[in-house]
Design a protein with these regions (language model features):
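S-adenosyl-L-methionine
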Residues: 1-53, 57
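Active-site beta-strand/loop signature of hydrolases that rely on acidic residues for catalysis
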Residues: 32, 51-52, 73, 134-140
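Conserved SAM-binding loop
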Residues: 61-62
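Conserved SAM-binding strand-loop segment of SAM-dependent methyltransferases
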Residues: 66-74
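Class I S-adenosyl-L-methionine
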Residues: 77-85, 97-207
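N-terminal Rossmann-like NAD(P) cofactor-binding module of classical short-chain dehydrogenase/reductase
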Residues: 87-89
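Glycine-rich, N-terminal phosphate-binding loop of Rossmann-like dinucleotide-binding domains
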Residues: 92
Length: 207
């Protein structure tokens, strides 16, 4: 995700939290080169930890965000054992969701790692009695909306909504019918948006 796009989403999360920016903590899964943690720092918050396995992106974040802890692979992280944060961001692998790939979807080996992020978030919520995280930001390609005829995106929304059972809200089920979404507004705040980098001061056409 381009930096201006990322700042938009992180700033909105900071605003909704309603606490001084210097008290806001962010954790990043599938971190890449640290765009989301950088946004947190630019907003006055604290990027606490990140999960990434590729050495070159890790080298970038170690240089620019030397105080951020690196946790390694998402498959080895226990959400109940790491420092709780207000915001968890994750850009899980997109290859199986992208229209440029074979579109194995969330059943694919790479894009299926989405569920590891959900597991970590669930574990943190359970360990903190639903207090952390307060916000979850998932970033991916537009193909995520059409993968497997939209069924994969339905899974994503349902997984996010079902996190509410750890906050005292009870489990929810998001039902798709005739191409429309219902049983949504009564179950918490979940929103999605497609942004195009060219309209955010970045010289590329990328959604």
């Amino acid at each position: 995700m381009a930096l201006p796009n990322a700042i938009f989403f992180v700033q909105n999360a900071f605003r909704e939290l309603g606490k001084p920016p210097h008290e806001v903590k962010l954790g990043s899964l599938f971190d890449g080169s640290g765009t989301m943690p950088l946004c947190a720092a630019m907003c006055g918050g604290h990027p606490v930890w990140a999960s990434e396995v590729e050495p070159y992106p890790i080298a970038v974040t170690r240089t620019h965000l030397p105080h951020m802890k690196h946790l390694g692979s998402v498959t080895e992280i226990k959400g109940s054992k790491i420092e709780p944060v207000d915001i968890i961001t994750f850009g899980s692998p997109c290859q199986d969701l992208s229209i440029a790939g074979k579109r194995a979807g969330l059943k694919g080996e790479r894009s299926g790692l989405f569920r590891e992020a959900i597991r970590i978030i669930r574990e943190m919520l359970a360990a903190t009695n639903g207090r952390y995280p307060r916000f979850v930001i998932w970033e991916n390609v537009p193909g995520a909306l059409s993968s497997n005829g939209g069924e994969d995106f339905e899974v994503v929304l349902n997984e996010l909504l079902c996190l509410r059972e750890f906050t005292g809200g009870g489990a929810a089920k998001f039902i798709r019918q005739h191409g429309k979404w219902r049983n949504f507004a009564n179950y918490g705040a979940v929103a999605y948006r497609i942004v195009n980098a060219q309209f955010w001061g970045v010289p590329q056409r990328r959604r």
